[in-house]
Amino acid sequence: VPELAENFYKGRTREVGALTERAICTTLLIAGLLLPFYIVCGEDVGVFLYSNARSGAMIAACAFVLVPMSLTLISTSMLNSMGCEKHTLGIFLAGSGAMLLCTVLQPRYLGGGALLAGMACDSCITALLSLLLLRKKTGRLRIGKYCLRLLAAVLLCVALGLPAHAFCARYLSYFPAFTVTMLLLAAAEVLLFSLMRLIDVRTLLCRFFAKKSKKISVRS
């Protein structure tokens, strides 16, 4: 964010656009890595944390909200660094108004789910408006192809994870099934995200072992 603000106020449009795209793509990547876990293992998480499978089902059903929430957080930070505090306040009020309307009008149809629907509307509206404003400020936001590759990887992970989880749950007890499913999902994500050119496993491993070797040399 400090580097983005410096380039913005110096009028370096190309650098600002590149930094913005990199930040948004990184945010989407992190959210995309977490999504299959929550969708596939949401019920297990609910049982583990709250001893309630229904709460876990709600986690799985609302996992997609993680994407607009993440985008809102990073976009708001970047816009504020560009001096757009008034705009981000207006966007926040628009999203909050939509959430309030949902919580007032939807309980009769959705019950307690009205609050979740309101939060989803709030996140989607604020994320969309923030991205539109970022595009206007930076002059570029070319992330369409990246989003398609990320979506394909996430959907494939979920498609593989759901039957794997069902199989493990049928033949294993709760905790072993949960653990095995998580490991299978992690392996599927590494494979599919690499195939979609979303992550570079070799680079990540080199950085990891380089940091470890530096720590060992410092200690010695």
Regions found by a protein language model. Name each.
Residues T27, I59-C62, L66, F92-L93, ...:
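Residue-level recognition of transmembrane alpha-helices
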